[in-house]
């Protein structure tokens, strides 16, 4: 009897690019020896739209609708970083009420982003039920966004010196109700997921990153805090009014996929604490700095004449960016979102460099998946939490 020879050739598998509704149009070229991963090469750029170059030909107000297309699941953070840069360049003060509204919107957006991470992450490792559960809270969140901003996604709500509109009547009470309801939902998630033995088998000890290794790779956000590094820009930089609230930085020591899950679950609870404190202490006053209009560099054009007074198309306000350099950053759900801005005494930025957290966090993926099983790739990739809109820009 002839015994068939065993093939020992390596196999190359293409994973992706997938539809943007999942992790995005990311392609992985995976080299396998049986079920063992030998090498992994991420292929990026399918969603590249030239966002940095577009910024050099737009005023800040004109560019605001573009930035919501970076991380389209956490658009408040991209808006915040866009208006914070000219505010610091021009030393523009933000009213206290506007700062509180910003914090509330940012933390609601953080919860929405973590929910949209949790559902697909659980679906990746074979648990379908949480994927449907998270849409209950997501719909309530988007109802709050729609009532305040007019849009469920791509809100275009932040403005230089404040926000576009004040909170509508009854919105604060609705937000209080959501906070109380959501805390019970987090308890349900922990009962359903955290103590599940099958879930623990899939994530515990998978994709371990040490603290020093995380720093050397430039990781940030939950990827960094899950490796034992207590670093949160809301505590470090104290931007907006975060230093007025009582909350704790969520972190873990082990650095595996389970730790990254626990950090994000804990962050959702802490975000609720921040929102509740902000709702209770929100002051009165203006929601925008009206003095900002003095900085408008738009020339008096024919659009302001009597014949055009009933035409809605008007030149957008523009602000001159002084000739200096500035780096601004915020703690986004996926890590440190930063902008390096160079002004040139013009209404257009001379350089607008984006520091996306997902792009930098993704660089460690090939190292994490080596010598792991093929099924572990989706677990590790899901625990990183990437959105290709901000990775490719």
Swiss-Prot record:
GO function term, MF aspect, one: oxidoreductase activity, acting on NAD(P)H, quinone or similar compound as acceptor
Pfam families: Complex1_49kDa (PF00346)
Subcellular location as annotated: Plastid, Chloroplast thylakoid membrane
UniProt keywords, alphabetically: Chloroplast, Membrane, NAD, NADP, Plastid, Plastoquinone, Quinone, Thylakoid, Translocase, Transport
Enzyme class: translocase
EC number: 7.1.1.-
Self-association state and partner proteins as the record states: NDH is composed of at least 16 different subunits, 5 of which are encoded in the nucleus.
Membrane topology: Peripheral membrane protein
Keyword Translocase among UniProt keywords: yes
Taxonomic superkingdom: Eukaryota
Family note: Belongs to the complex I 49 kDa subunit family.
Gene3D superfamilies from the UniProt entry: Cytochrome-c3 Hydrogenase, chain B
Classification via HAMAP family: NDH1_NuoD (MF_01358)
Name of the protein described by the UniProt record: NAD(P)H-quinone oxidoreductase subunit H, chloroplastic
One GO cellular component term: chloroplast thylakoid membrane
Known role: NDH shuttles electrons from NAD(P)H:plastoquinone, via FMN and iron-sulfur (Fe-S) centers, to quinones in the photosynthetic chain and possibly in a chloroplast respiratory chain. The immediate electron acceptor for the enzyme in this species is believed to be plastoquinone. Couples the redox reaction to proton translocation, and thus conserves the redox energy in a proton gradient.
Catalytically driven reaction(s): a plastoquinone + NADH + (n+1) H(+)(in) = a plastoquinol + NAD(+) + n H(+)(out); a plastoquinone + NADPH + (n+1) H(+)(in) = a plastoquinol + NADP(+) + n H(+)(out)
One of the GO biological process terms: photosynthesis, light reaction
